[in-house]
Amino acid sequence: MSAETPPCQLLERQSEAYRDWLWVAPPHDAWLHTVGGSVWSADATICQAWRARGRPVHADLAPTLTAPVPGAVLFWPKTHALGEWWLLALCAALPEGTPLQVVGEHQGGVKRVLKSLAALGLGCRKVDSARRCTLYATRTARLALSPEAAWTRFEAAGLTLESHPGVFGHGKLDDGTRQLLEVLPTALGDPAGQRVLDVGCGDGILGAWLGVRGAQVAAVDLDAFAVAATRRTFQANGVAGEAWQSDVFGDVSGSYDAIVSNPPFHQQRAIDYGPAERLIREAPARLVPGGRLVLVANAFLPYPRWLEDAFGEFTVLADDRRFRVYQAVKTRR
């Protein structure tokens, strides 16, 4: 089987024997499963795919690697600060001197890796370049800087928020989320006692805002960094909510009085409507009769058609030409 993604195509042409290596933050590419090894990823769908093939999976942000690995390959993410966190985390998790390769696309900023490695005191050499990607090689070392240093705390909407590189809206309040918060009192009334699910929770701002007003909140996100950020945000604001990884409703059970969301529509640099469409189409099954879905989206996105198909009708609660807040109610039967 041939590699599908450009970074994996570059790796495929190497003479390196990657058997039993650790793949870190990899893309979906079936070629990796033919090579073997283990995976360390914050993406729930990546972890699920590797578990389905019986491969070792590390899903924690600070895993304990029980067996040594001959080397690791880090797939450089589009968020540079997140890539730097992975470097710190790998140096903390792996024995000193473990071979570490970094691969990524030029348009994703992989060439900036050289400066990041130099700043950490890690030597580096260029191994190969093709398919508009570059592969670098270095070795892990004991570093003075901890991965914990990547976390950011800031204030917004009367809340204390914890955020991490790679999490949506990192370090600031997104304009769409701000608009959604402004209309939530109209949409939900008094949230006290309501069971509310935040899908695509990011740093947990929606759940925290509802939780401090008495709602029973739960939050899910595909990304382990977002789940960790949400848990920290809940703790910082005294909210007794739950947060866990889930691909939309994949690991959600039970019914809710309301579902709130600022759903993603990008996968890396490409537009991907899949998660938002699933959210809308599957929401009625997760709502009690009379329960409501309240979400914000860029005005150009095709959500009205999906809302009509799933709920029959919907209401626009706010529209500033950039963002729209939609509300749809599950009919009582």
Curated annotation (Swiss-Prot):
What GO molecular function annotations does the UniProt record carry, in alphabetical order? 16S rRNA (guanine(1207)-N(2))-methyltransferase activity; nucleic acid binding
- Keyword S-adenosyl-L-methionine among record annotations: yes
Q: What is this enzyme's EC?
A: 2.1.1.172
* Transmembrane residue ranges: none
Tell me if S-adenosyl-L-methionine is a UniProt keyword of this record.
yes
Keywords noted in UniProt: Cytoplasm, Methyltransferase, rRNA processing, S-adenosyl-L-methionine, Transferase
List the GO cellular component terms. Answer: cytoplasm
Main location class: cytoplasm
Indicate the enzyme's highest-level EC class: transferase
The listed locations are: Cytoplasm
The record's annotation in Pfam families points to:
MTS (PF05175), MTS_N (PF08468)
Q: Which reaction does it catalyse?
A: guanosine(1207) in 16S rRNA + S-adenosyl-L-methionine = N(2)-methylguanosine(1207) in 16S rRNA + S-adenosyl-L-homocysteine + H(+)
Record HAMAP family: 16SrRNA_methyltr_C
Instruction: Name the family.
Output: Belongs to the methyltransferase superfamily. RsmC family.
Q: Which proteins does it associate with, and in what oligomeric form?
A: Monomer.
Stated role: Specifically methylates the guanine in position 1207 of 16S rRNA in the 30S particle.
* UniProt name for this protein: Ribosomal RNA small subunit methyltransferase C
Please name the source species: Chromohalobacter salexigens (strain ATCC BAA-138 / DSM 3043 / CIP 106854 / NCIMB 13768 / 1H11)
Question: What taxonomic ancestry is recorded?
Answer: Bacteria, Pseudomonadati, Pseudomonadota, Gammaproteobacteria, Oceanospirillales
Name of the coding gene = rsmC
